[in-house]
Amino acid sequence: MEDHMTLNATLDYEIDLTATTRVAEEILPKLQKPIDEYLEAVSILRSSRFLCYDCKIKKIPQGGGFHNWHFENGVIGATPRTFVIQVYLNDDFEGGETEFLYQNRREQAVQGDVLIFPAGFTHTHRGNPPIGGTKYLATTWAIIQPDDDN
């Protein structure tokens, strides 16, 4: 039995480096203010230093997305994520909400909005499918940086 599988497939899009550069140069620097506001509201985190890593830009076609309920720090052996930062890159579609199970809340995508939430099971969520268009989303995760003394 093989322990992996190689798929030969043609993707329906190409990586656009100009878009990646735009995210790096225009969007990511603007996250500091929303992150500061989040840390001010969640006082237990104020004294910690954070590192945001692994920014992913997702193209979610009509009907697509990750519809299963999940949370962001549940993988054994993975870097423990403290909170999630999502930036909605467009809003020219219906549906496509980020839905939170225990909060009984749906966040509709509004272009330019930043959604920050805890990575733990308390904020189990899913991405509902976009209807009538494609959703673009940038996601990054924050981890607590250890003290220099450790």
Q: What are these model-derived regions, one by one?
A:
Residues 1-114, 122-150:
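Fe(II)/2-oxoglutarate oxygenase catalytic core
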